[in-house]
Amino acid sequence: MIITEPKWKSYMVETTTPIFTPKQCQMIINAGRSEPKQNASVGGREGKSGIDTETRTSHISWIPFSKTTEMYKDIEKVMKTTNGNHFGFDGMQITEMAQYTEYPEGGFYDWHMDCDLIMTKEPPVRKISMTL
């Protein structure tokens, strides 16, 4: 017997309805900029982690849940609706702080997969990644 994914499932979803107002966007930007900034790194591949300017050139900070509670509630609502309509995972919840990223002129983040394929640390937990 071969088990396949249901035909209704999607693997990439794009939403075009605005989630945040311009004022809310500015509040998120301010929250991200007020946190400690660090050079973005890459990781997950054996022997290749840390700063890799061929894959990524940007600066990041992490937005604490307590700093933007309403933002996280709004994102979770969209995530749960999107999950129900396209993926069907059980018990979805936000477990990671939002990563705020700024790109200098010429900065970028090349195509990548957020996972540790070798599973040296622990099994992957992230089911859905979202970009705002």
Task: Name these PLM-found stretches.
Residues 1-132:
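Fe(II)/2-oxoglutarate oxygenase catalytic core
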